[in-house]
Swiss-Prot record:
Function comment: Inhibits all the catalytic activities of DNA gyrase by preventing its interaction with DNA. Acts by binding directly to the C-terminal domain of GyrB, which probably disrupts DNA binding by the gyrase.
Family: Belongs to the DNA gyrase inhibitor YacG family.
Keyword Zinc carried by entry: yes
Record text on cofactor binding: Binds 1 zinc ion.
Protein name from the UniProt record: DNA gyrase inhibitor YacG
Amino-acid positions noted as binding Zn(2+) in the UniProt annotation, renumbered to this chain: 16, 19, 31, 35
Pfam families from the UniProt entry: YacG
Highest taxon in the source lineage: Bacteria
Species, as recorded: Mesorhizobium japonicum (strain LMG 29417 / CECT 9101 / MAFF 303099) (Mesorhizobium loti (strain MAFF 303099))
Amino acid sequence: MNSDSKITPLRPKRPCPECGKPSARDTFPFCSARCKDIDLNRWLKGAYVIKARDDEEEPDADEPK
């Protein structure tokens, strides 16, 4: 009996967010290192932005806490 037949996947396969191909275990949630790098490059270039709430004020560095 082959021991590989008893191995279950860690997570269900989902489509790659970049190209739609099935994801790979070693580059999850992407299908390849290429798609993973494309996504990282978009984050580094600022193409993706997580908006902050407008009512949040940043504390001044000069003010004591």
